[in-house]
Structure formats: C-alpha cells, structure tokens
C-alpha cells in the first residue's frame, strides 16, 4: 500500500512524494500554495474540546470551547463558566463540548464529560448567551476520554456516546418535558477500551458501535440486545474510530489512529467463503498522538475524506510529544488504490521543551499559534461559502482552518 503526499490539492492531484506505507522514513516538499487559511480564535486557550453552533441566533456559526463561547465572525470571547483543572494539572475537566438543544427551548446547550470527576453534564444556555451558563449533572459512569453525538438510530435525535473506561454505553434524551430524562443503555463491557467509533459494519442499514476490541451490532429492534463481535484488536485507538467504505467495494472499512503512539491504520473488510476477513494496513507512521479523526467531504468530489493530526501533549511524556504539530487530510484514491495526504497545517517542534515532562506546557514550549487536533475537532462550513472548514482546539490554542477550495 502506498501513500501519496499532495502538494496543492486533492483536486489537482500533484504528487510530490510517494512512500511505502510500511516504511517509517518521511521527507516533505514545500507546498507552493496554501489550501487552508489558519485563523486564531484564541491562541491562549488550553482546552481540548470544541463545539460549533449558532449560540446567539444571528445565523452565524459560533464556537464553544472550555469556559467560553466565541461569537462569529470576529471571535469575541464570552466566558460563561469555570472549568477546573484535573487532579493531573496538565488537563482541564472539559473532555467534550457537544452542542444540542437539550431542554427544547430553542437555544443550543452543551453536553460535556470529564475524565477526573467521571461526570457527564449538560451546560444550559441561559437565554442570553452572554450570561453565565448553568451546569446540570446527568450521570457519573466513569473516567471518559471524550464523548460525541451520533444519530445512532437515524431518527434525527442523536445519542451521546462517551468513551468510558471499562464500559460501553450511550445516553438517549428520551423526554424534555415536564422534566428532562436521560436513558443510559449499557452494552456488554467486553469491547471496552481506549477508542470509540461507529459505522454500518455489516451493511444492514443500521449504525453499529466500533471499539478497539471489535464491534457491536445494532439489533433490528431498538430494545433488542446488541451483539458483540470480537473480530479485531486496534490497541489504544482514536476517538473517533471511523467506519466507512473508503475503497468503494460495498463493505465498511475501519480507520483509526494510535491515540498515544505513532501510527494511522485501516482495516480493509472483505469476504472469504462467506466469512468476514479484516486486513490491516498502515496508512502513515510519521506523527504520533493520533487521537481525533473526523469524516467529511472536504474537496467536494462526492467521496469522504478524514481529518486527523497530532494531539499536542496528549501525554507530555509520550514518544514524539515535542515533535512538530500537524493537521492532515487523508483520502483514498480508488483508481490507484493509494491513500493521499494533504497538509492543513504543519508547525514547528518544541526542541527547548523541558526534559522533565511534568514541567512541560504546550503554550510555553511550542511557538505561539501552534495548532493540533485536541480531543475533538468540528467540521462545519463556518463561513457559509459552501465548503467544509475545520475548528481545532488543543493545549496550544483554538484555531479555525478556512477551506479555500471555493475561493480558489
């Protein structure tokens, strides 16, 4: 399997470098024209989660991250809550910022979760978004890497899917009046681990849940039992693990990164004598801390790509922690059977970072304006110009990457 590095766009397909996917040596040519424009929303923000919605009902997409929301288009900051540090001070208790009108009042609230307090909460929009927002507890299932909303039942009503240590579960908002009611659905914990995703794995039209240990088959009946299939081992995987038919052979493949190591991989699904066979192949091994992946059609060619990159200081002590930060888009060329990579952003490493990981601080160690993927990104058309942009949080700041496809 080969990986092609694109220098201008996936539209022009200008090849500047080819490497064997099983190799580890990489070199990159300078890109002559930018495909993306980086905007600083708050280069001093230390939070790693983000949500995008119209919080002030003016028709523009705003950004929620950590303790504040930022009003489009000039990103005026409005602090609306306090977010404590975790017992490990390198992290804040904001591991998800998922926008949803929880109480049905027409204003967008935020669903959040935390690792150290083990809590899921919703942050209520007060009506005037510039006033303090109100935190309401939902549950305390365990330490969570992050969580996200997914329309699991394709009903238009998303569920909250958290990555909980030792458990696999999701939460449905089953009632808004007269009182909010969240219904947790516990699945067999055999598949629990670092990493979580979804996709129609068996092509039956229903969305399944993917974990590092296998996948859970959604039953035909909403109240039926979810069947766990322990068909693979992914390791300490990303959130999300993406289930999608990348190669166009009518079955769902799986793509994931190593959240705390080097490596971006895919499992190609095929059938042999009627049985499912998963073939593991390396996509890229040139960067580490591949913690967040998101699917979108960034180049408007009708096929889905995914964005990922380096979560800066996912753990300060990990291999590659001080290497150059990066955000990349990968797409699969079905004609050549190659993965293509295009740069959204590549920064500078932090060679002067303290040798003691406990003394490291992303805002001090990396150059101002350095961007990574954080725990989650938002992929939305931020400027309403017809193409998908990227909002990326992290310990080194909060940034919007404007897609220049339409403007070129």
Predicted features, each with a name:
Residues 1, 23-25, 29, 274:
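Generic cytosolic/nucleocytoplasmic N-terminal low-complexity/intrinsically disordered segments
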Residues 29-408:
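Beta-propeller-forming repeat regions
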Residues 8-10, 26-28, 156:
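Compositionally biased regions
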Residues 5, 14-17, 92:
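Generic alpha-helix initiation/capping and coil-helix boundary signal
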Residues 12-26:
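Bacterial N-terminal signal peptides
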Residues 1-11:
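N-terminal secretory signal peptides that target proteins for export/translocation
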């Amino acid at each position: 399997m080969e990986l092609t590095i694109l220098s201008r766009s996936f539209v022009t397909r200008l090849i500047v470098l080819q490497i064997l996917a099983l190799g580890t040596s990489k070199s990159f040519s300078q890109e002559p024209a930018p495909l993306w424009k980086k905007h600083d929303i708050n280069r001093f923000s230390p939070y790693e989660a983000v949500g995008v919605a119209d919080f002030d009902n003016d028709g523009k997409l705003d950004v929620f991250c950590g303790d504040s929301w930022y009003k489009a288009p000039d990103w005026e900051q409005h602090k609306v809550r306090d977010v404590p540090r975790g017992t490990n001070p390198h992290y804040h208790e904001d591991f998800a910022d998922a926008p949803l009108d929880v109480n049905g009042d027409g204003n967008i609230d935020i669903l959040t979760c935390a690792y150290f307090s083990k809590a899921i909460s919703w942050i209520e929009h007060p009506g005037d978004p510039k006033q303090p927002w109100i935190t309401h507890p939902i549950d305390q299932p365990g330490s969570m890497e992050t969580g996200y909303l997914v329309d699991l039942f394709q009903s238009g009503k998303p569920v909250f899917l958290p990555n909980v240590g030792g458990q696999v579960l999701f939460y449905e908002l089953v009632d808004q009046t007269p009182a909010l009611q969240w219904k947790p659905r516990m699945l067999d914990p055999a598949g629990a681990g670092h990493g979580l995703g979804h996709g129609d794995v068996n092509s039956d039209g229903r969305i399944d849940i993917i974990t590092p240990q296998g996948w859970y088959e959604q039953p035909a009946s909403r109240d039926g039992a979810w069947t766990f299939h322990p068909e693979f081992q992914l390791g300490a995987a990303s959130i999300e693990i993406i289930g999608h038919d990348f190669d166009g052979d009518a079955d769902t493949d799986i793509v994931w990164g190593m959240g705390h190591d080097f490596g971006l991989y895919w499992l190609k699904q095929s059938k042999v004598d009627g049985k499912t066979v998963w073939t593991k192949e390396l996509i890229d091994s040139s960067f580490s801390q591949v913690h967040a992946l998101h699917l979108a059609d960034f180049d408007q060619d009708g096929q889905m790509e995914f964005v990922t990159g380096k979560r800066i200081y996912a753990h300060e002590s990990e291999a590659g922690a001080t290497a150059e930060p990066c955000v990349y888009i990968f797409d699969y060329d079905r004609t050549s059977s190659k993965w293509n990579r295009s740069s959204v952003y590549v920064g500078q490493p932090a060679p002067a970072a303290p040798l003691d990981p406990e003394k490291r601080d992303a805002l001090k160690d990396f150059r101002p304006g350095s961007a990574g993927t954080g725990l989650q990104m938002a992929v939305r058309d931020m400027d309403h110009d017809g193409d998908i942009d990227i909002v990326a949080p992290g310990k080194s700041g909060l940034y919007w990457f404007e897609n220049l496809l339409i403007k070129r």
